[in-house]
Amino acid sequence: MNAQDEDLVALERGDRRALARVLSVVERGGEAARAVADLVQASGTDPCSVGITGAPGAGKSTLTNALVSELRARDELVAVLAVDPSSPITGGAILGDRVRMQSHATDSGVFIRSMASRGHLGGLSLATPEAVRVLGYAGWPTVFIETVGVGQIEVDIAGAADTTV
């Protein structure tokens, strides 16, 4: 069994490090990402996904934080995919407003992952829909997707989430 297969097995046990590694595989794309996608799609596990979108400074992170707090008050597990602009230097995510979610950083019932848009228009990363499915496979029943600050024509989130706010 190779390391990726071990990570996929570890996902079922709730291993957060394995989840982070598998999400990195999905973000990189290629054959390994397709293998993950095939396994996850065959499982039929899809979480409830809620897209949070709006113009820069509209309060997306503040709203996401409040929604996460509400679900955690009900003892529900919740994941957040926060799509950020890509750094022109590293290509990675510029960690924008994550400071508003710091109160959840040590909560084992919350998983927060920043993803770089990598120049993709529409407020998402190309890997976002598959990352949502991976989170569902890993046992996260609700996923909030916070987009990069977007304008009126960037509506990719409406196709990637069950509900859009």
Model regions: which residues?
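Nucleotide-state-sensitive switch-loop elements of NTP-binding domains
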Residues: 3-50, 55-58, 64-165
